[in-house]
Amino acid sequence: MPAKPRHSAWFQSLANPSERYGLDEIVYTDRNGGLLQVVHDMEALKRTSGNRWKELFESRQHKSEWPYGSGVWGKKEWVLPELEPDNVVSMYEGHTNLFWADRYGRELGLEDLWLKLCGNTHTGSFKDLGMTVLVSMVKEMRARGKAVRAVGCASTGDTSAALAAYAAAAAIPAIVFLPRGKISIAQLIQPVANGAIVFALDTDFDGCMEIVKQIADKDGIYLANSMNSLRIEGQKTVGIEIVQQFDWEVPDWIIIPGGNLGNVSALAKGLDMLVELGLVTRRPRIVCAQAQNANPLYRAYKRGFESFEPIAALPTLASAIQIGNPVSYVKAIDAIKRYDGIVEEASESELAEAAARADRTGLFNCPHTGVALAAMEKLVANGTIKKSDRVVVVSTAHGLKFIDFKLKYHEMRIEGVESYFPNPPIELAAKYPLVRDAMLREIERRFGKHAA
């Protein structure tokens, strides 16, 4: 028989460290309804030096040995160390590229701007990083005889796509609850295509979340939202991966959009492990960017985190973060405090214009990335972010999931947004003189009279 792993992890109450559960137990909160976190045996992990961890992670990168070629499972000892490899459900997620935004950065006065393109993955968003972990654990639970009938989630689009795909790969039934008419067609069709049971409910995300929590509590459906801390274990690898891609050098800033706030919490957790296990010695500053129409964390930040109050989120172009009562606010506040962090907001106009401005330099941004870019632009303008700082913006989803947003922007049909960078197609008769004149006129207008 193979030797058992030397490393271990468990669920632990945030409020009461003595309250623990096994990762294969069906539990989402502590006895008082508070959040759980996955805690690792750090003393066991520290028996391996920081340099040895670097060597191990580098040796697995982009390799085909199962399951270590995945950006998540290449760090298995830090994620789910005791999971049987045969129960891993992976689509080789992670390893998404860092885009050096040279032209966009120069336009803003930044010398070292990068975007972490988490949308360049199987279902088009960072949610794959967490869902591979959760669905793998569910597969193992079912193999052990646990009574898990199906997995379910409330979603504003990206979570449902990831859950449906990974559950389909594992032959596990998936049930998703979406706010009717509030997500893009591309986001809706993904769980439909992957065979999930899809409910479109006449409510917002928070209303869908209340329904799925009741179903998880009463009907044997395993909850896959980010209040389930297993998701955080996969999502935390984005911070680790960013540092690894910079040859283990820590950037000055990491800017990330926030809705349900699991992602900013996960980012900090991954960075914490890098420091505690000796791979790096410094921390970046973290910025959490929220849409102005769904900004409870920003409001709490402006009050010095004296209190946190849920709000009724208003409609926003950044539909995936239209969340007024985020589950992970306690973890997010802790992360912001410990990382000398900032919470910034972006109006609908600011997020749309920032996304379009960056698109003109070769990117293709989702509206949520637009929120992060707009926050960054504000911090550059007020001098908080300096010219020479190395800045990484986490782009959370692929722009192709939001083509309606793109089309309406360029057709100047978004209410309250002026569209400073519209680029609608030029419709002409198919006659060479007309086409030539229009082409030369546009080249001169856009690039100057002496454009090469």
Predicted regions and their residues:
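PLP-dependent amino-acid enzyme catalytic core
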Residues: 1-452
